[in-house]
Swiss-Prot record:
Belongs to the ClpS family. This is ATP-dependent Clp protease adapter protein ClpS. GO terms for biological process: protein catabolic process; proteolysis. Involved in the modulation of the specificity of the ClpAP-mediated ATP-dependent protein degradation. Disulfide bonds: none annotated. Gene3D superfamilies: 3.30.1390.10. InterPro entries: ClpS (IPR022935), ClpS_core (IPR003769), Ribosomal_bL12_C/ClpS-like (IPR014719). Binds to the N-terminal domain of the chaperone ClpA. It holds the Pfam family ClpS. Signal peptide: none annotated. It comes from Campylobacter jejuni subsp. doylei (strain ATCC BAA-1458 / RM4099 / 269.97). PANTHER family: ATP-DEPENDENT CLP PROTEASE ADAPTER PROTEIN CLPS, ATP-DEPENDENT CLP PROTEASE ADAPTER PROTEIN CLPS1, CHLOROPLASTIC.
Amino acid sequence: MLKTQTLEQTKLSEPKMYKVILLNDDVTTMDFVIEILMNIFHQNLEKASQTMLEIHHNGSGICGIYTQEIALSKQKKVIDAAKLANFPLQAKVEEE
């Protein structure tokens, strides 16, 4: 007796990606925002300065695009660092 096997193919899809967005406020210093962008989002000084100016002029700016778990982790790091430095800086995560 012959046995046949059916192979089931699983279709893998790319994970959803999420934007981490910093929100401008009237208290957090530009230098602190640059520090956050360099330390948490690994931007060089030039890129961090550009992103900081975007946040300052537009009210918000995208710092990076990540999988959900990483985006939420970076959001928490931003909020924790801001609280530690007594700044009201906020970050939000949005699906791309």
